[in-house]
Every structure is written in C-alpha cells, then in structure tokens.
C-alpha cells in the first residue's frame, strides 16, 4: 500500500507537478515510515480550507510536509520562517511547493501575511503550525 496517493484529494486541489516529484515525495515518506491517512472530499472543491499542522517540534516536520505535498501532488500553501527562503535553490523550491516566507519578528506579521494569502486563494489549502515555533509549547499562539 502506498504511503500517499493523489486519489486522496480532489482534482481541483492538485498542483499537477512532475510525476518524478510525486514519486520522490511518496518514496521519502515510505522510506521514513510515514503514511498519509484520510483525504479531502469532493464537496470541498473550490473552497478555501485551512489545515492545522500540530505539533511542530522538529525540522523534520518541514521535510515530511513537503514530501506529503509532493506525494499528494497537492496545491497547498504553507507558511515558513523567512530565513529558510533566503537560500536561492531551497527558497525557489519551497516557493514552487507552495511556501510563503513570513517574518516572525514583525509584530502581527504572520497573521497579516496569512490573511493576505488566504484572501488571494481560490480553491486551495493553507497549512500552518499554530505553535509558531518548533519548541514544545503548552498552548498555541493566537
């Protein structure tokens, strides 16, 4: 049984990236022992959905998340620390996969950036880790 499949999401949420990238995402997840369960039903087609990803406690979360996005071939927008995007090749790849750099040092910056991005979307998903950090926290940032 594959770790993830494009059949888990409706066609309207697919990014139609190269099959080699989809295969790479599935292979990374499978190799690391991860599997994506569930999916998104067709009734959500054309709607704006927010996917909450928690807990975010490791740098591996980003690697696994991008692998899942690739394996699903999902059109998912996700928020990431702006410093990750400053490296040319990594930044370009992260943007290609749906990443949006946000500067967490600006007061209210991440919230306004997320609101601005959600308003621009039409029938896509946004994934965010509400803790705002990889450290273990007792409650989410609001």
For each feature predicted by the language model, list its residue ranges:
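Soluble catalytic domains of membrane acyltransferases
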Residues: 14, 31-142
